Amino acid sequence: MEWAKWTPHEASNQTQASTLLGLLLGDHTEGRNDTNSTRALKVPDGTSAAWYILTIIGIYAVIFVFRLASNILRKNDKSLEDVYYSNLTSELKMTGLQGKVAKCSTLSISNRAVLQPCQAHLGAKGGSSGPQTATPETP
């Protein structure tokens, strides 16, 4: 940086002051044209990196908030299994097989994907359109 010497006895004090002001502000401004008098402030690289990081964090925060709201709203809905088994029960009521379903419902099913023999027997007789397994029937 060039320092301008202040000499109060000279007649060009205003010129030296404007030169000094130009040197002080010259480091912080750019884009100075003769036709356009607007000046843009330089943004240090650290500031632009901080805005970049904050933007990424903000995007992830918005995604997190929407997923959290979705999970909260989903807890009020019935699960897919509840809907499937309630529809199955209503279909069995219409066909008159409710007595056999009540007998099989006392079994505790640990894995719902595997049908118990009683359920496979009901599915074969009732003409159910659900998945059928090849489990042997026990007497």
From Swiss-Prot:
Residues spanning the membrane: 46-66
Localization per Swiss-Prot or TrEMBL: Membrane
UniProt topology in membrane: Single-pass membrane protein
A GO CC term attached to the entry: membrane
Source species, domain of life: Eukaryota
Gene: SMIM34
Protein name according to UniProt: Small integral membrane protein 34
Keywords associated with the record: Membrane, Transmembrane, Transmembrane helix
